[in-house]
Amino acid sequence: MSDQQQLPVYKIALGIEYDGSKYYGWQRQNEVRSVQEKLEKALSQVANEPITVFCAGRTDAGVHGTGQVVHFETTAPRKDAAWTLGVNANLPDDIAVRWVKAVPDDFHARFSATARRYRYIIYNHRLRPAVLSKGVTHFYEPLDAERMHRAAQCLLGENDFTSFRAVQCQSRTPWRNVMHINVTRHGPYVVVDIKANAFVHHMVRNIVGSLMEVGAHNQPESWIAELLAAKDRTLAAATAKAEGLYLVAVDYPDRYDLPKPPMGPLFLAD
């Protein structure tokens, strides 16, 4: 057995924040920019060996993350500062490591997760924003956030989300368990906050697209429940844009003792 094979292997978890507006999603792909590719390149430079990361949730093109979690294995012994400050120095400005934690062998960023939480941010104003144009979704018709919240409560619990599932979704089942869904207004911002054990493809954006129709009084409050029961994607509203969506938190069993920083995005109070 070579000396290289005898080196100890370290398993490391990282919290990652990124502005997804300039990336073709999280997942590494040929010939297009991805968050995974940039992160692996920076980690490999610090480790001085090739690094492959596994994430809690693969976000789509244009979607952001403030609470993404990844893990990787390495034979490179490094201090925490190397995996945070050192990696950040090698990352583009729109991706950053928020925290680092050594984890046991049985930890997996995706398969150990018990829930994911997303926030969808709508800038509800007659005029479009400029500074946050890629960080929020603009909707000019006045929205009734309380009406949206009431309509959304039928989605709680375990349900078949076929009506809110992208046609190209590869998940084996449309059933998901929604733990909470809250719609609140913060000045001109309407925030849809949803937590579930997992999500089918485009589930949050499809739910938000239909909730905006309810909030604008284009559909009755009962419409969301009717869509859920119909199990027909063609009956629901168009998919909401990617710009307003953030993966803000991932839950894990307490025994892993992972950090829980403020969820953000930073222009919102927690």
Curated annotation (Swiss-Prot):
Formation of pseudouridine at positions 38, 39 and 40 in the anticodon stem and loop of transfer RNAs. The active site is at D60 (nucleophile). Residues 107-111 are annotated as: RNA binding. Its EC number is 5.4.99.12. This is tRNA pseudouridine synthase A. It catalyses: uridine(38/39/40) in tRNA = pseudouridine(38/39/40) in tRNA. Belongs to the tRNA pseudouridine synthase TruA family. Keywords: Isomerase, tRNA processing. It comes from the Bacteria. SUPFAM superfamilies: Pseudouridine synthase (SSF55120). Homodimer. InterPro entries: PsdUridine_synth_cat_dom_sf, PsdUridine_synth_TruA, PsdUridine_synth_TruA_a/b_dom, PsdUridine_synth_TruA_C, TruA/RsuA/RluB/E/F_N. Pfam families: PseudoU_synth_1. Residues 168-172 are annotated as: Interaction with tRNA. GO terms for biological process: tRNA pseudouridine synthesis. The record marks R58, R78, R110, R126, F139 as: Interaction with tRNA. It comes from Shigella boydii serotype 4 (strain Sb227). GO terms for molecular function: RNA binding; tRNA pseudouridine(38-40) synthase activity. Substrate binds at Y118.
